[in-house]
Regions:
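Noncatalytic, solvent-exposed loop/strand surfaces
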Residues: 28-191
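Bacterial N-terminal signal peptides that target proteins for export
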Residues: 2-16
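Bacterial N-terminal signal peptides
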Residues: 13-25
Length: 191
């Protein structure tokens, strides 16, 4: 069963378009990486300068646009790449896009049959994280992947729900992996 929220459409394209419009004032400057949820210091603050105090009457210029699937993931920025985790129908996709052009550099995909117990969007529910040349994602069914940042090739994966016998819960798994000191930390379950 696939809900309408998991099909590509106007809202996801609009969401990415708004993000790109917000980044437009910074085009030509080297933006800081935003390698995981809440940014470089995990505090939601950006050190960038030169933000517009007010948008032009016609709105900010659109750099490019891309149709994307559903989910709750935020976009991660690393080395001029946008890393996006999204779902189209019954497939989860991790995409690397060139931040300047929107051109897809690679895509890693895998099937999912996860459905939210209460009919909300079926995910993914958390952002990717980039650390030391790897992209880490945790899907709503509890599959943790590590992909090579430059190619998107799978380095390894683990089904943490199966390995640790975690019962299904309200939201599935939905916490962005935390990578520090060469170790990956994941919230394995909860309410």
């Amino acid at each position: 069963m696939t809900s309408l929220n998991n099909k590509p459409g106007l809202l996801p394209a609009l969401s990415l378009g708004v993000l790109l419009a917000c980044l437009a004032p910074l085009a030509g400057s080297r933006a800081d990486d935003w390698p995981h949820w809440l940014g470089p210091k995990r505090d939601g603050a950006s050190a960038e300068k030169g933000w517009l105090k007010k948008w032009p009457a016609a709105g900010p210029p659109r750099l490019w646009e891309q149709n994307i699937g559903g989910g709750y993931s935020s976009i991660i920025i690393s080395g001029g790449r946008l890393i996006l985790f999204h779902r189209i129908e019954d497939t989860l996709h991790i995409d690397s896009l060139d931040a300047a052009t929107g051109k897809r550099q690679w895509r890693f995909s895998y099937p999912t049959d996860y459905e939210d117990l209460y009919g909300y969007d079926a995910g993914p529910r958390c952002a990717p994280a980039v650390y030391d040349g790897g992209v880490y994602t945790l899907g709503p069914k509890g599959v943790l992947h590590c992909l090579a940042l430059d190619t998107g090739k799978k380095k390894w994966s683990i089904d943490i729900r199966a390995r640790y016998k975690i019962a299904p819960n309200f939201f599935g798994t939905g916490a962005t992996p935390l990578i520090t000191g060469g170790k990956v930390f994941c919230n394995l379950g909860g309410i």
